[in-house]
Amino acid sequence: LGQSFSDYVNQFRIEESKRLMDAEPNASIQEIAERSGFHSISTFRRAFQKCTGTIPSDYRNNR
């Protein structure tokens, strides 16, 4: 506990996006964001950075 419902949902979505990036390295960041439940790439990037400390493209490039 100790986190808001929206933070919980975003954390779940970010974990799914990380799984998708690992499983489908040729998928675009936009596609990963949409498939993870984000309607905006900027919202996805902001949530991803908040949860992981890095932006999606850096995460992908450092895997």
PLM region descriptions:
Residues 41-42, 57:
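Key DNA-contact positions within bacterial/archaeal DNA-binding proteins
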Residues 35-36, 49, 58:
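Short, surface-exposed, polar/charged, turn-prone segments marking secondary-structure boundaries
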Residues 50-51, 62:
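Alpha-helical DNA-recognition elements
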Residues 43-44, 48:
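Short hydrophobic/aromatic patch on the recognition helix
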Residues 1-39, 62-63:
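Terminal helix-turn-helix DNA-binding modules in bacterial transcription factors
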